[in-house]
């Protein structure tokens, strides 16, 4: 029963993120969503609920990827939009630290889901960092 209620709340939360019309806020909310999912993944890990754990870990990567897509949809080169890219990069770096700790704590059965999400987060982080550190395009 509790998981059904939790699943409903999560679906509403994700829909609220996707419905945000302002791209900058959408990117921030997507990272908020990712952080909440990682916190929930830790709780599910401690309680032993493997299905909810896997879903929460995957939600973390989805949120970070959606943040990157929202930032890219702004249409500006990242070096011209550092105000939004750099905070996103820092928050994804924090997510990477947290998911690495979770990977080290997770059991061997749970580890593949965490490793896959960590790989996806690393890809998002590298894309954000490359964008921030790249030179401005010539006009």
Locate predicted features.
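Long, charged/polar, soluble alpha-helical segments
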Residues: 9-139
């Amino acid at each position: 029963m509790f998981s059904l209620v939790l699943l409903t709340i999560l679906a509403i939360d994700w829909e609220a993120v996707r419905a945000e019309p302002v791209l900058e806020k959408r990117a921030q909310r997507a990272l908020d969503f990712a952080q909440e999912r990682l916190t929930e993944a830790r709780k599910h890990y401690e309680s032993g609920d493997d299905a909810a754990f896997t879903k929460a870990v995957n939600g973390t990567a989805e949120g970070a990827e959606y943040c990157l897509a929202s930032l890219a949809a702004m249409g500006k080169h990242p070096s011209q939009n550092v105000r939004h890219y750099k905070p996103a990069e820092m928050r994804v770096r924090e997510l990477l630290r947290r998911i690495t700790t979770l990977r080290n704590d997770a059991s061997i059965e749970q580890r593949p889901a965490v490793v896959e999400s960590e790989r996806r987060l690393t890809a998002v982080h590298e894309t954000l960092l490359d964008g921030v550190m790249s030179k401005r395009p010539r006009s």
